[in-house]
C-alpha cells in the first residue's frame, strides 16, 4: 500500500509539473518547487517574466490555484511566483529562448551558438545544447553544441547536470531542444582543495617554554649531585 501511495504521489507531481509548464511557457518557466506544509501545499514557480504568470490583480494565479485543487486534488495550494535570478544559467529558460528563435526563422546553428556564447559569458562551467529533428533536409538528425565539463553518466550526470527541454513548431515538423548545464554548486568527485593550516604548533617540536623547563630541571639535578 505504501509503494502504491508513493507511485500515486509521484504521478500526481508529474502531472502538476506538466500543467504548470504549459501554463507558464510564455513567461519563461525556469523551475518549480513543491512542498507540503501543515497549512497546505506550497508551490514556488521560478519564471523569467513573473507578471505574465500573476496576471491582472492575480487572476492568472487564482485560476491556476483553482485548477490544481479541483482537477489535480492538491490540498490547499498556495502559489508563489519568483523571478529567475540568472536566466542565462537556467536550462529551461535557455531551451525556450532557442525554440522561440527557431520559430522566428533563425538557423539552428545561429540559435545554438548564440545561446551557447551567452551561457559561457554568464559563467557556466559546462554546457550541452542539442537540437534534434528535421533541422536540414528531409531526414531527422541532431546537432550538439558543447562547452566545458559535461557529464553523461553516473552521479555527476544525474545530479550535477541540470536539464531543460522545449519544442519549436515549424513547417517541416517539431524540433526538440535539450539544454544541460553543470550546476555551479555541484562539486565534481575529481575536484579537491588542500587547506592551508596556520597558527598551530608543528607536531614533533617542543615549544620554547617546554625547552626552558627541561633545561632548568637538568641544572637542578646537576647541582644536587
Curated annotation (Swiss-Prot):
Residues 202-225 are annotated as: Disordered. Keywords: Ribonucleoprotein, Ribosomal protein, RNA-binding, rRNA-binding. Residues 16-85 form the KH type-2 domain. The keyword Ribosomal protein applies. GO terms for cellular component: cytosolic small ribosomal subunit. Pfam families: KH_2 (PF07650), Ribosomal_S3_C (PF00189). Residues 205-225 have a biased composition (Basic and acidic residues). GO terms for biological process: translation. InterPro entries: KH_dom (IPR004087), KH_dom-like_a/b (IPR015946), KH_dom_type_2 (IPR004044), KH_sf_prok-type (IPR009019), Ribosomal_S3_C_sf (IPR036419), Ribosomal_uS3_arc (IPR027488), Ribosomal_uS3_C (IPR001351), Ribosomal_uS3_euk/arc (IPR005703). One of its GO terms (molecular function) is rRNA binding. Part of the 30S ribosomal subunit. Binds the lower part of the 30S subunit head. PANTHER family: 30S/40S RIBOSOMAL PROTEIN S3, SMALL RIBOSOMAL SUBUNIT PROTEIN US3. Belongs to the universal ribosomal protein uS3 family. This is Small ribosomal subunit protein uS3. It comes from Thermoplasma acidophilum (strain ATCC 25905 / DSM 1728 / JCM 9062 / NBRC 15155 / AMRC-C165). The lineage of its organism: Archaea, Methanobacteriati, Thermoplasmatota, Thermoplasmata, Thermoplasmatales.
Amino acid at each position: 500500500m505504501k509503494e502504491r501511495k508513493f507511485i500515486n504521489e509521484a504521478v500526481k507531481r508529474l502531472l502538476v509539473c506538466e500543467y504548470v509548464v504549459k501554463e507558464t511557457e510564455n513567461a519563461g518557466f525556469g523551475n518549480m518547487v513543491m512542498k507540503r506544509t501543515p497549512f497546505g501545499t506550497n508551490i514556488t514557480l521560478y519564471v523569467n517574466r513573473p507578471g505574465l504568470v500573476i496576471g491582472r490583480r492575480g487572476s492568472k494565479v487564482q485560476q491556476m490555484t483553482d485548477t490544481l485543487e479541483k482537477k489535480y486534488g492538491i490540498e490547499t495550494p498556495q502559489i508563489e511566483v519568483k523571478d529567475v535570478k540568472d536566466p542565462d544559467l537556467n536550462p529551461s529558460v535557455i531551451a525556450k529562448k532557442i525554440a522561440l528563435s527557431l520559430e522566428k526563422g533563425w538557423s539552428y546553428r545561429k540559435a545554438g551558438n548564440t545561446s551557447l556564447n551567452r551561457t559561457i559569458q554568464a559563467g557556466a562551467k559546462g554546457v550541452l545544447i542539442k537540437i534534434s529533428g528535421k533541422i536540414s533536409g528531409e531526414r531527422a538528425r541532431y546537432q550538439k553544441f558543447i562547452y566545458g565539463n559535461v557529464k553523461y553518466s553516473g552521479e555527476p550526470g544525474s545530479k550535477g547536470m541540470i536539464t531543460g527541454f522545449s519544442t519549436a513548431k515549424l513547417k517541416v515538423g517539431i524540433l526538440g531542444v535539450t539544454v544541460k548545464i553543470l550546476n555551479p554548486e555541484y562539486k565534481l568527485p575529481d575536484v579537491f582543495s588542500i587547506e592551508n593550516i596556520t597558527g598551530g604548533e608543528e607536531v614533533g617540536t617542543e615549544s620554547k617554554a617546554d625547552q626552558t623547563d627541561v633545561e632548568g630541571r637538568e641544572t637542578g639535578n646537576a647541582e644536587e649531585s
